[in-house]
């Protein structure tokens, strides 16, 4: 059976940590683990997912939950509550449901204090890792037989009915992910017509029916070129010379959004090298299978700008295509010939210097999974037997996750993000005496996960921002500061600082709190909004050069409603506890941030959410920030409009439900059939509670609470529904812990802020 291990480093000499691997999550297969009954339970969960895969596409993350509940000997002993039609919700009913949720969720905490959870969903994460390991000859070492079975299970589980795969697990079929999944199946040993339910034959038919892989988008062209299934001359240029441009130029990598910079850094190295993996018999077979014409007859120059309509979310402006054409025709031919190839050699050396710097400052985790595989391959190309590559191999397990739908690759983990919200939800429950050990461990995890130092050396020359005092999205080893993760963790530390140390442990040192505030202030823009990773401010026109076809707003850093709201809430709380620290700066920061939130409100009263679905999510965040800063329904028209938006979008069953299509379409779209989603319902509930809806008319809150109470499962869990996370407008992300955190939190706020009748009265 599969088993989740936390905070374990093992004895690998190529593995090192800044805090003894606190927050690390790795899976191992133990053939002797589990009883026959437990193994049967796992198989039942797999079968249930398979049979319902078109109805509920995200996993319920069952495997590790079974493991933890067994290890903790958890049994739900608090009786379940249901609210009948026409029945009032009593204080006792709300308390019982809340206690059941709190006890169940506390049992899912890891020993190091964090809450593990799947953070995956995009279907272009895993195949490049399989391709990279195939090229480097490490596939069978890293992924033995049991791993390969689970990878194939995941691919089969998320194949669409038409034979293709979407950009993410809920998306329509795309050429990019269908081609990658097909290649992955073939590398893992499936025949050209093999796989569950004829998966390969159906996938190949989809590919050929939609123009063959000549229509794959640019990232696909890159990976296929690396693998030997495409010619580099069919790709737009990615010159590594960008890394030796003068820094004052607007298109210098230092001006880019960090993820864009980090993806194209190793891509440009591999492009500059024109690296191609070994041409094996399988590669030759795939050349025949993926095209509608003979491989040797393809005019690669003509397919450079081809992109299947199913993949095309962001059409390239004419000016961008002209730029690529100019580089392709006039620049590249010179840079590959003497004497200009000397410049290319220098550019490649500089690029590799940056790759090594980023690898070392993230303990070889890198900033994310797309970059991880590319940087690992670049290190192998530089030196197949070198320590850099071996240190990359040691960190692959950090990205792997196993659930009832198989093995997948995570974004890189949401340990700190999930734990920050989990702690706030549990504290809001006011059930402190029942969960003291849970709170103490959670506090300890947050304290130990703060980034204590800036990136090494002259980090500004490496285009890095300060990170000291921040929290990451995942764990301390990852190293990359994020403003909203920092703000939410800071809120937790401030809440804990007001509680007895015998309950929650020693409070965080003042200087560490000050470092967090300093980091947040450094990420605020002139318009009052906060960026996520690095200061925003590059020219907006650079977005015209977005080289991807399926993302938007990826070239430069932007401000975000969620980051801004989280920072407001943290700053307001900090100001009350430390009124003398940078008083004027913090007051100005809060004022400007509030103005930013008011400025970006949509005409219908909502806010566009950047990291969750979508207008419901953004509106919950914005309302939290505004009310923390003292705005009310009566003194703030912005808040008034937000309340109107939420009231109007409430469903007939009392809940809220928003389609993920709101994110790419940028227009509020209800779930099909006007059904509700419990996570969306929780966000909307908390937004209304922030605005003191209970004082005006508690009916919408009672209706929503009834839905949450009646939806709770026998164990105290809540059912998994639609995917709720998003990034870059068009790609969804599955936060498996959300279905527990937010209903629990909403019920806690409801019980605390809404007057409820008591049975005893």
Swiss-Prot record:
InterPro entries noted in UniProt: SQ_cyclase_C, SQ_cyclase_N, Squalene_cyclase, Terpene_synthase_CS, Terpenoid_cyclase/PrenylTrfase
Residues the record marks as active site: 484
GO terms of biological process kind: triterpenoid biosynthetic process
Record pathway: Secondary metabolite biosynthesis; terpenoid biosynthesis
E.C. numbers: 5.4.99.39
Swiss-Prot/TrEMBL PFTB repeat ranges: 98-140, 148-189, 439-483, 513-558, 590-630, 639-680, 701-742
Site feature: Transition state stabilizer: 417, 473, 611
Membrane topology of the entry: Peripheral membrane protein
Keywords per UniProt: Endoplasmic reticulum, Isomerase, Isoprene biosynthesis, Membrane, Repeat
Localization in the cell: Endoplasmic reticulum membrane
Role according to the record: Component of the oleanane-type triterpene saponins (e.g. ginsenosides or panaxosides) biosynthetic pathway. Oxidosqualene cyclase converting oxidosqualene into beta-amyrin, generating five rings and eight asymmetric centers in a single transformation.
Family, similarity comment: Belongs to the terpene cyclase/mutase family.
Name of the protein in its database record: Beta-amyrin synthase 2
Organism: Panax ginseng (Korean ginseng)
């Amino acid at each position: 059976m599969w088993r989740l291990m936390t905070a374990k480093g093992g004895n690998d000499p190529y593995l090192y940590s800044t805090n003894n691997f606190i927050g690390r999550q790795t899976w191992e297969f133990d053939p002797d683990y589990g009883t026959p009954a437990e193994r049967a339970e796992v198989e039942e969960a797999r079968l249930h997912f398979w049979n319902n895969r078109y109805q509920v596409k995200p996993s319920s993350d069952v495997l590790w939950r079974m493991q933890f509940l067994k290890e903790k000997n958890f049994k739900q002993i608090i009786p379940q509550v249901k609210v009948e039609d026409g029945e009032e919700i009593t204080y006792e009913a709300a308390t019982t449901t809340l206690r059941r949720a709190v006890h169940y969720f506390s049992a899912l905490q890891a020993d190091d204090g964090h809450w593990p959870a799947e953070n995956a969903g995009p279907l272009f994460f895993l195949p490049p890792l399989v391709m990279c390991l195939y090229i480097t000859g490490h596939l069978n070492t890293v992924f033995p037989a049991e791993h390969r079975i689970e990878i194939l299970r995941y691919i089969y589980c998320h194949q669409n009915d038409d034979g293709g795969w979407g950009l993410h697990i809920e998306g329509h079929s795309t050429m990019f992910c269908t081609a990658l999944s097909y290649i992955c199946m073939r590398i893992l040993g499936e025949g050209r017509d093999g796989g569950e339910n004829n998966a390969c034959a159906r996938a190949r038919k989809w590919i050929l029916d939609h123009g063959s892989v000549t229509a794959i988008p640019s990232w696909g062209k890159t990976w296929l070129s690396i693998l030997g299934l495409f010619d580099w001359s069919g790709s737009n240029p990615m010159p590594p010379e960008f890394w030796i441009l003068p820094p004052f130029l607007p298109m210098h990598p230092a001006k880019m959004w960090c993820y864009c910079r980090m993806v194209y850094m190793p891509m440009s190295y591999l492009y500059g090298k024109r690296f191609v993996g070994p041409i094996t018999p399988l590669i030759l077979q795939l050349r025949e299978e993926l095209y509608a014409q003979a491989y040797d007859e393809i005019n690669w120059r003509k397919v450079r700008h081809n992109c299947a309509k199913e993949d095309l979310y962001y059409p390239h402006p004419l000016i961008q295509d002209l730029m690529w054409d100019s580089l392709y025709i006039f620049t590249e031919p010179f840079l590959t010939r003497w004497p200009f190839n000397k410049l290319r050699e220098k550019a490649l050396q500089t690029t590799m210097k940056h790759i090594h710097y980023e690898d070392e400052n993230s303990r070889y985790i890198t900033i994310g999974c797309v970059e991880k595989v590319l940087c690992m391959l670049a290190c192998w190309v530089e030196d197949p037997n070198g320590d850099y590559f071996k240190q990359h191999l040691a960190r692959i397990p950090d990205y792997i996750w196993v659930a009832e739908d198989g093995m997948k690759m995570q974004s890189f983990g949401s340990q700190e993000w999930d734990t920050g919200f989990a702690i706030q939800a549990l504290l809001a429950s006011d059930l402190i005496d029942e969960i003291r050990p849970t709170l103490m461990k959670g506090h300890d995890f947050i304290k130990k996960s703060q980034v204590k130092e800036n990136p090494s050396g002259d980090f500004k020359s490496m285009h890095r921002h300060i990170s000291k005092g921040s929290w990451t999205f995942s764990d301390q080893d990852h190293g990359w500061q994020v403003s909203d993760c920092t703000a939410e963790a800071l809120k937790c530390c401030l809440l804990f600082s007001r509680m007895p140390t015998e309950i929650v442990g020693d409070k965080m040192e003042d200087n560490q709190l000050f470092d967090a505030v300093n980091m947040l202030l450094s990420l605020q823009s002139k318009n009052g909004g906060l960026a996520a990773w690095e200061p925003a401010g590059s020219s907006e026109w650079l977005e015209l050069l977005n080289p991807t076809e399926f993302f938007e707003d990826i070239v430069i850093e932007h401000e975000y409603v969620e980051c801004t709201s989280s920072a407001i809430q943290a700053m307001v709380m900090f100001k009350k506890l430390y009124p003398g620290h940078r008083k004027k700066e913090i007051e100005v920061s809060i004022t400007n941030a509030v103005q930013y939130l008011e400025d970006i409100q949509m005409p219908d009263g909502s806010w566009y959410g950047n990291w969750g679905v979508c207008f419901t999510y953004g509106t919950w965040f914005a309302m939290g920030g505004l009310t923390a800063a003292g705005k009310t329904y009566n003194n703030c028209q912005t808040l008034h409009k937000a309340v109107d938006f939420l009231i109007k979008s409430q469903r007939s069953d009392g809940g809220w439900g928003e389609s993920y299509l709101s994110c790419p379409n940028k227009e509020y779209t209800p779930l099909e059939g006007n059904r509700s989603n419990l996570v969306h319902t929780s966000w909307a509930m908390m937004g209304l509670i922030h605005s003191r809806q209970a004082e005006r008319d508690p009916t919408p809150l009672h209706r929503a609470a009834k839905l949450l109470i009646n939806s709770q499962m026998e164990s105290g869990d809540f059912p998994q529904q639609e995917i709720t996370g998003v990034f870059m407008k068009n790609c969804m992300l599955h936060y498996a812990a959300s279905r527990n955190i937010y209903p629990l939190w909403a019920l806690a706020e409801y019980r605390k802020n809404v007057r409820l009748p008591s049975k005893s009265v």
